[in-house]
Amino acid sequence: MTDQNRPEETQARAARFIRHLRESADTEDRPTVMVLAFEGWNDAGGAASSAVRSIATAAEAELAERIDDEDYYDYQFTRPRVRRNGPHREIVWPSTKVYRAQPESAEMNLLLVSGVEPSFRWQSFTAELLTRAAENDVSAIVLVGALLADVPHTRPIPSSLSSEDAALQEALDIDEPSYEGPTGIVGVLAHTADQAGIPAVSLWAAVPHYVGQAPSPKAQLALMRQLEDLLGLTLEVEEVAEDAEAWERGVDDLAQEDSDIAEYVQRLEEASDTPNLPEASGEAIAREFERYLRRRRPPEA
């Protein structure tokens, strides 16, 4: 059955995303999507930045440029590091790195942006990043974040997609963001990109707040799977999945040693165990099966 003949609701999210970007640009060329994550306030458990770095490694991304203007960083908060490079020592300054990738498993090119949330001049920083996006003909931006929440570590990590762009909401069947309150650089970039005419998607995962320290491989895995579905990637997640299982066992052991924590986790489990969990939906199960088939598919000769 051809893609055109399949019901809309059964087509992969990545295919809908690609088609929307091509139709918007009136071209059949591979679109370029910028994916960003920042360490700091938007990155509970280091899950978002770890997910984007994992994609950069898997896609064999090459470093394209750095944004290291010292006006953006408070070096007492984000300190430079000293490291040895052969017989010499060097200073590594905080920066935002931009990587370029053309993953074979996807129908799009990627600009992967990873760094530390800047301390100062956010408006100038976002303007500089959006200038880089325009220079590279970026068709859409994906912002990746993780937040602390009242969720149990024993259940699937909740994750969500949203966009301020009405056309993307319809194409991807996602909601408009409803959050109001303090925001980080991820929220600023999502709104600024939309105002600049670059459609933006925000992807967030909820990290159990009682184990919010890094690493958080279970949340990282949830974000990587969402990015697989959205970008059409095929990622090797076995190592991260093993880390997630070990992490969950470790938290189980800690909870068993403290009756108050164990009781609290049980209350969170009861609150989350509803019949309408998105992880149990037909669409979620279908996406998981598609991932399984992609990983089993032999490479083309």
Would you name each region that the model predicts?
Residues D3-G115:
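N-terminal short beta-loop-beta anion/metal-coordinating cradle
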Residues F38-N42, L112-W122, L172-E180, Y210-A214:
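Flexible, glycine/proline-enriched loop segments at strand-loop-helix junctions
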Residues G46-S50, F120, S124, E180, ...:
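Conserved active-site and cofactor/substrate-binding residues in soluble primary-metabolism enzymes
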Residues E65, L111-V113, V142, P199-W204:
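Hydrophobic/aromatic beta-strand patches that form the interior of the parallel beta-sheet core
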Residues M108, V116-A167, L189:
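Internal, conserved structured core segments that host functional sites
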Residues D150-L230, T234:
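Catalytic cores of processing enzymes, dominated by hydrolases/peptidases
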Residues V211-A301:
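A conserved C-terminal secondary-structure "cap"
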